[in-house]
Amino acid sequence: MKPAVIVSAGAVLAAAAVVALAQASGPQASAQELTFLGQPVTAEDLRLGEAVYVANCAACHGADLEGQPDWRRRQEDGRMPAPPHDASGHTWHHPDQALFTITKGGVGAVVPGYESDMPAFEGALSDAEIAAVLAYIKSTWPERERAFQAEVTANDEGGS
């Protein structure tokens, strides 16, 4: 093979690898594509949500939304570790209203008697801050997960 052909093939492979990596990491959804509880999400909402997440959620759910290790296995006290909020977790399986209710009132607000290390954020965060942090989390999901969660939310709201 000629050196020029080898260099050209290498450049094509390198470009393909860059595109594949960019698609795998997935860009954050733009604010124009997102809604939360039926309301459009703004870029300002996403900035607020990220700040609220870092200050109130990342210590347990991870700086990269990765959750705690072995999050599917009960701890010695019988409680579950903090789950991831990225695509590897189950947050995107739940409608907006359930996510809001859990964050505001604690897991016990949805599952009476359930004991969790996650506090209720009512009184600590405003409704707008809770909505913003959940919109931020949604913005990090790949398109497939966002679309699934949007359908779950629409069905929960009596939509299609």
Give a label for each model feature.
Residues 96-104, 127-138:
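An amphipathic alpha-helix signature
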Residues 8-20:
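Hydrophobic membrane-insertion alpha-helices, especially the h-region
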Residues 66-100, 119-125:
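Gly/Gly-Pro-rich "capping" loops immediately C-terminal to redox-active cysteine motifs
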Residues 24-52, 147-149, 156-160:
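Electrostatic cytochrome c docking/interface patches
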Residues 43-44, 50-81, 104-114, 140-147:
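Periplasmic/extracellular electron-transfer cofactor-ligation site
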Residues 1-4:
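Positively charged n-region of N-terminal signal peptides that target proteins for export
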Residues 39-42, 46, 50, 92, ...:
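Solvent-exposed, acidic/flexible segments
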Residues 73, 83-84, 105-131, 148-156:
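Axial heme c-ligation environment in periplasmic c-type cytochrome domains
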